[in-house]
């Protein structure tokens, strides 16, 4: 894989209704931009039940599925796509683990979260998940296609 292709890896992030209500969107975007990732898609919406169920389809048989769908559809979500080298893995590290109380200080959930059911942000857990989630939340024309990364970031 060429370096250019690696630098163009994309991930899906969504600031959940609790993070939006608490005014954390700007802080979260700033963290990813300061890391060197490029914001290539951004929108705010209240997800439909169908979108939420499709997004969390892997959890359909889990006991928390109904509550998760209800929560994510309870208010505005800020959906984002970031691009950059290793962005999927880096974004997950920056988010922290699912339970905010177990997340390291310095991570988004470690710094701002207090409850596993209100953990502020979703991030894709693999390149494959990112591709699926991006396609679910964004139309191709809603994403920037020609992004020139800062030349000081990569060799």
UniProtKB/Swiss-Prot annotation:
Compartment(s) of residence: Cytoplasm
Gene3D superfamilies on file: Nucleoside diphosphate kinase-like domain (3.30.70.141)
Keyword Magnesium: yes
Naturally occurring in which organism (per UniProt): Dictyostelium discoideum (Social amoeba)
NCBIfam families: PRK00668.1
Main location: cytoplasm
Record text on subunit structure and interactions: Homohexamer.
Binding site for ATP: 16, 64, 92, 98, 109, 119
Gene Ontology terms for molecular function: ATP binding; metal ion binding; nucleoside diphosphate kinase activity
Any single GO CC term annotated in Swiss-Prot or TrEMBL for this entry: phagocytic vesicle
PANTHER family named in the record: NUCLEOSIDE DIPHOSPHATE KINASE
Primary role: Major role in the synthesis of nucleoside triphosphates other than ATP.
Cofactor requirements of the protein: Mg(2+)
Keywords, alphabetical: ATP-binding, Cytoplasm, Kinase, Magnesium, Metal-binding, Nucleotide metabolism, Nucleotide-binding, Phosphoprotein, Transferase
Record has Endoplasmic reticulum as a keyword: no
Protein name: Nucleoside diphosphate kinase, cytosolic
Domain of life, source organism: Eukaryota
Enzyme class, first EC level, given as a word: transferase
Record's catalysed reaction(s): a 2'-deoxyribonucleoside 5'-diphosphate + ATP = a 2'-deoxyribonucleoside 5'-triphosphate + ADP; a ribonucleoside 5'-diphosphate + ATP = a ribonucleoside 5'-triphosphate + ADP
Enzyme Commission (EC) number: 2.7.4.6
Matching InterPro entries: NDK-like_dom (IPR034907), NDK-like_dom_sf (IPR036850), Nucleoside_diP_kinase (IPR001564), Nucleoside_diP_kinase_AS (IPR023005)
Residue positions of the active site: 122
């Amino acid at each position: 894989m060429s370096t250019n292709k690696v630098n163009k890896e994309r991930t899906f992030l969504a600031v959940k209704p609790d993070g939006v209500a608490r005014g954390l969107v700007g802080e979260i975007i700033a963290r990813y931009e300061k890391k060197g990732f490029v914001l290539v898609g951004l929108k705010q919406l209240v997800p439909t039940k169908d979108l939420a169920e499709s997004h969390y389809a892997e959890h359909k048989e889990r006991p928390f599925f109904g509550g998760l769908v209800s929560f994510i559809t309870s208010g505005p979500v800020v959906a984002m796509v970031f691009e950059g080298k290793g962005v999927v893995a880096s974004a997950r590290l920056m988010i922290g683990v699912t339970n905010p109380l177990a997340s390291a200080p310095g991570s988004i959930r470690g710094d701002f979260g207090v409850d596993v059911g209100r953990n502020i942000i979703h991030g894709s857990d693999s390149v494959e998940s990112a591709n699926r989630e991006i396609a679910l939340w964004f139309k191709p024309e809603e994403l920037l296609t020609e992004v020139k990364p800062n030349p000081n970031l990569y060799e």
